[in-house]
Structure formats: C-alpha cells, structure tokens
Amino acid sequence: MSNVFKIKFLYLILFKTIFSVKLDSNKVNEVLLAQHNKYRKMHNAPDLVLDNELIKLALDYAAALAYKSDAYSTYPSGTKNKNRERLGENIFSCISVLKNKPCYDITSTKPVDEWYKEINNYNFEQPGFTIDSSHFTQIVWKETTKVGCGAALKDDDEKTYKVVCYYYKAGNILNPEKFKANVIEHSYKQRIIMNYFSLVLILFYLF
C-alpha cells in the first residue's frame, strides 16, 4: 500500500464522522434484510443472515461515500473480509432536492427495490454477467449466505444519502454456468408456464 494511499485513507477515516452521519444500522439492516429475503424467496434462493463484520464494512464505506463522493477511488477495489475472501457489493445513492422531503429514510426498502428492478435487464435464456443487471443478480445469487448493510447521510444543503450492502459469498462470478445455477427465474413466472402447459395437455386429452 503506497504512502499516498495510506494518508488519504487515514484522513478519510479520521474526518468522515465530522462531515457525514452514520444512520441506525440495526433498523437499516432489519428492513433491508427482510426485503432481500422477500425477493430471494421468489427465485428459490435461501434466506440471508446478517453478519456483523459485513455491517461494519458497509457502514464505514457508506460514511466515506457520503462524505466524499469520489471515495470509490480512495477505497481499494474488490473489498474482502478478514479471511481475505472477496465480497459482493451493492451501492445506492440519492440526493434530496427539497430540504423537507428526504429521498431516503432508514425504514425504506427503496435501495433493494431499485436494485431488484434490474431483473428487467437480465436474460434468463442466456445466463451471464451484464453491468446493468448486476445489482439484481447479487440480490438473488443462490450461493450467497450473508449480508450486511450500512447507511450514511451527508448533512448538507443537498442531503446526500448512501447505502452500501456487502455480501458473502460474492455473487456475479464471471461464468455462465455459475449464473445458470445461482440466478433462478422468478418462481411465479415458472408456475404460470407450468400451468399453461398443463392446461394445453388437459385440452389435448379432452379434445
């Protein structure tokens, strides 16, 4: 790690709490965990559980991003846990235009809902990584077992909100077979297709 990076990183850690406010991580994680698991059930993925290490990492990064919008370049890419295992990551940002109308609050499921909307960009018939569906695929990635989220606010005139979620095991492994095994088509859609073919078979035998 270069001396320049160390200085930038230490400066960010020392002063971020002055310029950004970490929001209640217990409430944030309670809400976002429930919404993650709601969507995962729809894709036959097991429920996630909260992880304190991931929560701390996410909260620190959210505070850094809220304080300094170019913190992406300050933090090293490919965040890892204490065992040096790569983590998945989703980031949500919004800026309140009106002072009395915040774009986000800690009881909101908006970050996960916005990430999940990327399902519309994913082609289940050709499984694989695309940048415009990567938030969605991480949410429903079947092998992922843990999540931890953090939210922070830059309390200035614009009120910049940042929400970060980290995941273990990381999703979005660049292998089509991994996507095929981990990103399962919406179970509701599957039931519609099965019911359609069942109806066709019934009609075939009747007539």
Language model segments and positions:
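Generic short amphipathic/hydrophobic targeting helices enriched at N-termini
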Residues: 9, 14-17, 180, 188-190
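Second-shell loop/turn segments in exported
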Residues: 22-26, 42-49, 90-102, 135
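Classical eukaryotic N-terminal signal peptides for Sec-dependent ER targeting/secretion
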Residues: 1-11, 192-197
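C-terminal single-pass membrane-anchor helix
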Residues: 197-204
